[in-house]
Regions:
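Short, positively charged
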Residues: 1-6
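A solvent-exposed interaction/effector surface
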Residues: 8-14, 18-185
Length: 185
């Protein structure tokens, strides 16, 4: 505290007290930001730990998922512009001629004014892709072929499990691929 010069000032004690309060508020704001970043890191760690044991590159399975929430990010040009890409697991929605990114919410919905969308509950055909994203279409074909008699929807969901945040070599990336089976009512 002596180094800060706060107490060595010759100004009135009220001025020194005001500066001390301002410094305390600034430190508190920095602490809150650090805690927010730490929470984001812990969220990613938890998602990877929860997901990695289920990775099976050889087999495809049918899985029931509850409704899930995500924050839409947009296309590839918008991907790095906002915080959501960095703070939440990345999900990519592949349409026939589109590719939209989102941030999967794995815990409480954020308080900030983020737009929240829903991935519907349902039964999904699930497989995994290992490697660079440039080759993911091969895994899409393999999984669609496996589920060809299951009335699959057109949109393919790809959730990055092991990505550039934890692995430098893109040959080691791991992506969970989900294709929803259409409801037949």
């Amino acid at each position: 505290m002596r180094q800060s010069g706060i107490f060595r000032t010759r100004k009135a004690p009220d001025e020194a007290l005001k500066r001390l309060k301002e410094r305390s508020a600034a430190i508190h704001a920095q602490w809150e930001e650090m805690m927010r970043i730490d929470h984001a890191i812990l969220r990613k760690i938890q998602f990877i730990e929860d997901s990695k044991d289920g990775i099976d590159y050889e087999n495809i399975q049918v899985v029931k998922y509850p409704e899930r929430k995500y924050i839409p990010i947009g296309d590839e040009e918008e991907l790095y512009a906002g915080e959501s890409f960095y703070f939440y697991p990345t999900i990519v929605f592949y349409g026939e001629k589109s590719k939209e990114f989102g941030a999967l919410l794995t815990d409480a919905v954020p308080e900030e004014n983020a737009e929240i969308r829903t991935i519907p509950a349902g039964t999904y055909v699930v497989g995994y892709h290992k490697g660079a994203y440039e080759q993911i279409q091969d895994s899409f074909k393999r999984i669609k072929e496996w589920g060809r008699n299951l009335n699959l929807e057109d949109t393919i969901l790809a959730l990055n499990i092991i990505d550039q945040f934890v692995e430098q070599n893109n040959d080691n990336y791991s992506t969970r691929i989900e294709i929803r089976i259409a409801d037949t009512k």
